Amino acid sequence: MENLSSACTHFCFDLFKKINENNSTGNLFFSPISLSTALAMVFLGTKGKTAEQMSKTLHFDAVKDLHSNFQTLNAEINKKDVSTYALNLANRLFGEKTFNFLPNFLSSVKKQYSADLGTVDFISALEDARKEINKWVSEQTKGKIPEVLSTGTVDRSTKLVLVNAIYFKGDWAKKFNAEHTTDMPFQLNKKEQKTVKMMYQKEKLPFNYIPDINCRILELPYVDYELSMIIILPDNINDDTTGLQQLEKELSLEKIHEWTENMMPTDVHIHLPKFKLEDSYKLKSQLAGMGMVDLFNSGSADLSGMSGSNNLFLSEVIHKSFVEVNEEGTEAAAASAGIAMMCMMREEEFNADHPFLFLIRHNATKSILFFGRYSSP
């Protein structure tokens, strides 16, 4: 399963860099695990060149027993006996009721991804179909994503809508005291600032300083330490935008492992803004630009493992996400453990009053559930 987590992390940073081409300074938030899972369900039904392109783009070529690994990963993430946090990754296919999907494909998707096929009438009851899909996503994300499909995103030629939703709500292992939250300035760049509600606590937490890129890394565990938020904060804004440019160029699976492996429990003065991010992406152009060209092309998509007809292709990949960070913890949605005993003696400052990157990690599987950039209130 480690290979699968690595593949999903590689894809996470590839996609981040692609999205960054058209949005290099704004807030950003998405769920790589949710997207990888959704696209793996499609991959199950692809053949030929379409499958090759997907495998390469998603780094699936390095993973043995891909779909059974996803089955194990999803079971680990969706553990039902957890009472300290809510985490739910859900998948579903919605198919045009007159269209024939191969029974083999449907049974594989059900077995490996716990996803069934909802049949809807795109041809004569388009609006009802759209509402039904939105209702399912809203239920899976506890109402945080009420409308994954806006008007006009599906039409009467739609045959298949692939929906994937992930929801997370967790409390910090060490909560912030709301009485210590105050209005403070947040520096957007060298010239502009805005006021934020800044939380504060002093706590012993895993911390690391990376001198090569002048960055501080802090781990904020959630209750039970099964999940953590990891925040990567440059010392200063040293470029003409967010101060994150050098760090973002360096991002890779290897670097994240290197930076987070040597974290030491350290007394840290933490200033972290309360924030809420909501994002919506249409990812067809980014994924095609990363190499998945044929999947979205009606003339060349090979989804013959999904349907006997040769005119099926994917028209769009829509991803919506939501995260809220406050004194109690984090609530996040997207449609789509122990601490070492060595200890640093000195106290460190971790003052997130300027743009930073953050990720929410499932510690046992080292899977990045969510990845984001906070650059503006």
Curated annotation (Swiss-Prot):
Keywords: Acetylation, Cytoplasm, Protease inhibitor, Serine protease inhibitor. One of its GO terms (cellular component) is cytoplasm. It comes from the Eukaryota. Gene3D superfamilies: Alpha-1-antitrypsin, domain 1, Antithrombin, subunit I, domain 2, Serpins superfamily. The record marks M344, M345 as: Reactive bond. Belongs to the serpin family. Ov-serpin subfamily. This is Leukocyte elastase inhibitor. It comes from Xenopus laevis.
